[in-house]
A protein has these predicted regions:
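Hydrophobic helical h-region of N-terminal Sec-dependent signal peptides
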Residues: 14-18
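Patatin-like phospholipase
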Residues: 2-4, 9-10, 21-79, 87-298
Length: 298
């Protein structure tokens, strides 16, 4: 993260903090009605993190500045990369620790759906000739069976378990250090699905499973894919979960140029981005009186 980006984050987050200080708690006015009147309670602050692909590291920068400014976060909602960063933060990871894990990760290995070679049994190393993502093909009584995604997502979910290690064993997302919701999309109906319990790593993977590129995740009988299709900036869910004030961080990915559409993942991601933009626009049409939007210039 370069110096100019850090300054921009600091200015945006500082503006958010000052805006919340200016409005005070629910129902608070500039002048107290009585010297003996009890101070209004401080507003509960929710954080809504958008999807945005590789730009998701920007969420960590915002979290670091909010932490430095001691802005309390009472709940988190996230979509796609926002769910990954938000879920990791909600599990108890400090932003600096999260940034280190993400920057040092072997992303090539993670997206190859294959553990490090040293961890593979000798008898399995002979299978190295298989295709990069090893999608499973087969024949069933219904005909040819094709993979639901180029990437099965096994290594991705394993990495998410590492990110969420502090919350190991917690399945009720209300009982995490910070209450959390991940947003996904039901591929059968197109409905937005709010994941509030179960494996936090699985919830993260469901929220970022780009259709056609990363295999969908089945949770409670529903086949789930990238949440950006149905709700890419879950401001409404942050309000439902806890928030009097929502800090919404929008890092939505702009359309890729033709020269950048070089893989199945980038093509599928482009379609998700188009759909996600519509949902972000819809969310921003209904802002709360005291909500704060942070949109880093990336």
């Amino acid at each position: 993260m370069n110096a100019s980006t850090t300054v921009a984050y600091r200015a945006l987050a500082a503006g958010a903090a000052m805006a919340m200080l200016a409005v005070g708690g629910p129902g608070q006015t500039a002048e107290a009605t009585s010297p003996a009147a009890a101070p209004a309670p401080a507003p509960r602050i929710g954080l809504a993190l958008s999807g945005g692909g590789a730009r998701g590291i920007a969420h960590v920068g915002v979290l670091k500045v909010l932490e430095e400014l001691r802005v309390p976060i009472h709940c988190v909602t996230g979509t796609s990369m926002g769910a990954i960063v938000g879920g990791t933060f909600a599990s108890g990871r400090a932003p600096a620790e999260m940034e280190k894990l993400v920057l040092e990760a072997d992303w090539e290995a993670i997206f190859r759906d294959k553990p490090p070679r040293k961890e593979i049994a000798v008898r399995r190393k002979a299978d190295d000739y298989k295709t990069l993502f090893a999608p499973e093909f087969g024949v069933t009584e219904d005909g040819l069976a094709l993979p639901k995604g180029v990437i099965a997502g096994v290594s991705i979910e394993a990495f998410f378990r590492v990110l969420a290690t502090p919350a190991f064993g917690i399945e009720d997302f209300d009982k995490l250090p910070i209450p959390f919701r991940a947003l996904a999309t039901d591929i059968e109906t197109g409905d937005s699905v709010v994941i509030e319990s179960g494996s936090i790593a699985q919830a993260m993977r469901a929220s970022m499973s780009v259709p056609g590129a990363i295999a969908p995740v089945e949770i409670d009988g529903r086949l789930l894919v990238d949440g950006g299709i149905a709700n890419n900036l879950p401001i409404d869910e942050a309000r439902k979960l806890c928030a009097d004030v929502v800090i919404a961080v929008n890092i939505s990915t702009p359309p890729l140029k033709r020269s950048e559409l070089t893989s199945a993942l980038s093509v599928a991601g482009q379609l998700v981005n188009f759909l996600g933009k519509q949902t972000v626009d819809d969310q921003l049409k209904r802002p709360g009186d005291r909500d704060v939007l942070i949109a880093p210039d990336l």
